[in-house]
Amino acid sequence: MKKDTLLLIILILFCIVHVYGIYVHIYGINVSLENVSQYLYNTTVYLSYENGTPCFYIGEKKEFVIIPPYIKVDRDIAPLIKKLRFKIENKSYNLIITKKNVNTNKMAIIFTSINGSREVNGNKTIIWIKDPLKLKQSEVEALYELPEKGEVIARYKDGKPAAIKINNKIYVGFKPDEDVLANLIYIHIVKKTSNPLPYILFTVFLTLASLMLTFQETLKKKFLELISALASVKVFILSRINLLDEEKVLLNDTRREIYNYILDNPGCHLRELSKNLNKPVSTLTWHLRILEKANLIKSKKFGNRLIYYPADMDMRDLPLLYLKNETQKSIFEYLLKSPAHLRKIAKDLNLNVETVRYNLKKLENLGIVKSKEEGNRIVYYINESILKFHK
């Protein structure tokens, strides 16, 4: 009897170990099962069309096919996605876009179109339109001068921008009847599940069945292969962040409004949020803390202010996003190269001395620029604490 009890305890312990391994692997915790070598997150996903239907797959040999490609989208771009014959279902999948590679033999994902470009003072000015297919009506969204550091992501063969990153968003150029440029955007699909319990119970069943049948090396090896395969298929359920927690955090209307504002205005500070969202500082502080704990946003001391930005944003973009004034941006970029005195800055940037003086004072008040006396001149330089954003 004692022997049977001991055996049962051993079986339960084996089961718990295997279940825990699957569980942590599913939720992207930095622990992996033994013998698992294929991961489906942080991997290039390819797009092809089979019988007119878009199909995502992992790897050039299509080892892992993800179908049907349900995509969660905003209302503004839903008509564009439907034009490409994608199915839209908010309950099934998220589509995460970042700056990497995607290979496709047809036009892939459209977010916002580049209507055209022209030469202006040696810089290319991009005119953005929100509705390139004229499903409602086209409108100019913004004018943006290039080049800017890290903004152009890809170009078409004719040299025109194919994809551009601005304010932490990626805008893809729309070119009807032409193949989209390879190496455009990086996509990975994260499948959501409302409850991991069925997978855990299924794993418990497999573990018990396998261990009860035999402890022979051959069957143990097959069992591990099965668990590994199961883990590698399920690993894209949640990648790094528990999307269920993220969903719960953003179910709150106020929190979602704050989060969306930060997405659109990275580098904003508390008083700006309070003014533009018409909410008290105490309320904002509470919700901002929750968003940070959920790893949806981050905060950083920038000059004299604490600023907020999306968690996945490149910190090197923050200073230029924070400085809304183009003159201040020019002065900031100039001083990044080397310290200088007032008249040299004005001369090299072809700006009025008083204009430069006024904006330098603003930058000093923000704690972004500092000054020191060198001989009979005052030299301006970037605050050391700001320089870490550009390392």
UniProtKB/Swiss-Prot annotation:
It comes from the Archaea. The keyword Magnesium does not apply. The keyword Amino-acid biosynthesis does not apply. GO terms for molecular function: DNA binding; DNA-binding transcription factor activity. Keywords: DNA-binding, Transcription, Transcription regulation. Residues 235-330 form the HTH arsR-type domain. It holds the Pfam family HTH_5. InterPro entries: ArsR-like_HTH (IPR011991), HTH_ArsR_DNA-bd_dom (IPR001845), WH-like_DNA-bd_sf (IPR036388), WH_DNA-bd_sf (IPR036390). This is Uncharacterized HTH-type transcriptional regulator MJ1398. It comes from Methanocaldococcus jannaschii (strain ATCC 43067 / DSM 2661 / JAL-1 / JCM 10045 / NBRC 100440) (Methanococcus jannaschii).
